[in-house]
C-alpha cells in the first residue's frame, strides 16, 4: 500500500482487474473519461471511522481517497442533499457491542448529522431518536429525506420507512416495509425514474414511498453482507459496497439477476453507506 499525491494507491490482490489509481490521468493508456464520484464511510461504526471518496473512471480505474475521521460513533449512513450537504445518522442506536470491539458499551440514541466533505467530521444535531438502529438514509429526487429503522425483529414496527426533517431531525413513520427478518435495510438509493431501492445484506428491494411497502427484486449473487447502495445517474448503474474485513469492496449491481460485479477493493474494512456525487 502506497500513497502518492495524497491519494491511496494499491494493486488489488482479490480483484486483479481493478487498480486503485493515484493519478488523475488514470491507469490505462486509453483517453481519460469523466469521473463518477461516490462518498462512503469505512471502519464503521467505530468513532475512528473515515469518510472516503471513491472515483470511478472505468472497471480498471478506481481511486479511493481518505478524507478524514468522522469523530463520532455509529455514523453508518451517508446521504447527499440537492444543496450538496452530506448527512448521516450517528450514535449508538440499539447497537449492543458486547465485546467492546467498537467502543460502544451500551445502546443509546441516534441523531441526524452533517458531514464536512473536506474533513470528514460529523456534527450531530436535532431531536434524538431511540431504539431505531437506523442504517439506511437517502434523499429522494424531490428533496425528501428517507430512512429505515427499527431493527428489532419482534417489534411491530420492524423495518419501517420514515421521512426525516433535515432541519429538526424529527422522524415521521410512513409505514412498515413488510420485509421479513433478516432483511433489515442497510442502505437506500433512487434511480432517475424515482424508484426507491433498498438493500438488505442479502437482497435488493424496491420500496413504495407512499406506503413504505417493500417488494423483493432479487437476491444478491456473487457477494453478500451488502451495506452500501448508491445510484449513478450518468451511467444509469447501481453500485454497492460490502461490510467485511480485512477489506471491503465496490460492486456494480445487476438489478435483473442480482449479480455483483467487483470493481475494486476499497482498501479499508467495514464499509457502510454509499452515495453518488452528482455533477
How would you label these PLM feature ranges?
Residues 2, 18-40:
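Bacterial Sec-dependent N-terminal signal peptides
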Residues 30-67:
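An edge-strand/N-cap motif at the start of beta-rich repeat modules
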Residues 37-42, 85-88, 144-147, 195-198, ...:
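Conserved beta-propeller blade signature
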Residues 44-48, 92-98, 102-106, 151-156, ...:
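Short glycine/acidic-enriched loop and turn motifs that connect beta-strands
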Residues 55-59, 115-120, 165-169, 208-213, ...:
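Short loop/turn segments that connect beta-strands within beta-propeller blades
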Residues 65-71, 125-130, 174-181, 218-222, ...:
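Surface loop/turn motifs at the tips and blade-to-blade linkers of beta-strand repeat domains
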Residues 71-81, 131-139, 181-189, 223-233, ...:
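Repeated scaffold domains used in trafficking and secretory/extracellular systems
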Residues 249, 255-279:
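Blade-level signature of beta-propeller repeat domains, shared across WD40, Kelch, NHL, RCC1
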Amino acid at each position: 500500500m502506497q500513497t502518492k499525491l495524497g491519494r491511496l494507491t494499491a494493486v488489488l490482490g482479490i480483484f486483479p482487474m481493478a487498480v486503485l489509481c493515484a493519478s488523475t490521468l488514470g491507469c490505462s493508456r486509453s483517453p481519460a473519461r469523466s469521473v463518477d464520484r461516490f462518498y462512503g464511510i469505512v471502519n464503521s461504526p467505530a468513532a475512528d471511522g473515515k469518510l472516503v471518496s471513491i472515483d470511478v473512471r472505468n472497471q480498471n480505474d478506481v481511486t479511493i481517497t481518505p478524507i478524514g475521521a468522522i469523530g463520532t460513533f455509529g455514523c453508518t449512513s451517508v446521504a447527499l442533499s440537492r444543496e450538496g450537504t452530506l448527512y448521516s445518522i450517528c450514535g449508538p442506536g440499539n447497537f449492543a457491542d458486547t465485546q467492546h470491539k467498537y467502543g460502544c458499551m451500551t445502546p443509546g440514541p441516534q441523531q441526524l448529522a452533517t458531514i464536512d466533505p473536506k474533513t470528514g467530521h460529523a456534527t450531530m444535531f436535532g431531536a434524538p431518536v431511540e431504539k431505531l438502529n437506523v442504517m439506511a438514509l437517502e434523499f429522494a429526487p424531490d428533496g425528501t429525506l428517507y430512512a429505515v429503522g427499527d431493527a428489532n425483529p419482534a417489534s411491530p414496527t420492524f423495518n419501517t420507512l420514515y421521512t426525516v426533517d433535515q432541519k429538526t431531525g424529527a422522524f415521521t413513520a410512513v409505514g412498515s416495509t413488510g420485509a421479513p427478518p433478516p432483511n433489515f435495510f442497510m442502505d437506500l438509493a433512487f434511480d432517475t425514474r424515482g424508484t426507491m431501492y433498498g438493500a438488505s445484506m442479502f437482497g435488493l428491494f424496491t420500496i413504495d414511498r407512499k406506503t413504505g411497502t417493500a417488494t423483493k427484486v432479487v437476491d444478491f449473487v456473487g457477494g453478500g453482507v451488502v451495506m452500501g447502495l448508491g445510484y449513478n445517474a450518468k451511467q444509469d448503474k447501481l453500485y454497492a459496497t460490502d461490510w467485511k474485513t480485512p477489506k471491503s469492496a465496490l460492486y456494480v449491481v445487476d438489478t435483473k439477476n442480482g449479480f455483483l460485479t467487483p470493481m475494486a477493493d476499497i482498501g479499508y474494512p467495514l464499509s457502510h453507506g454509499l452515495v453518488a456525487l452528482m455533477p
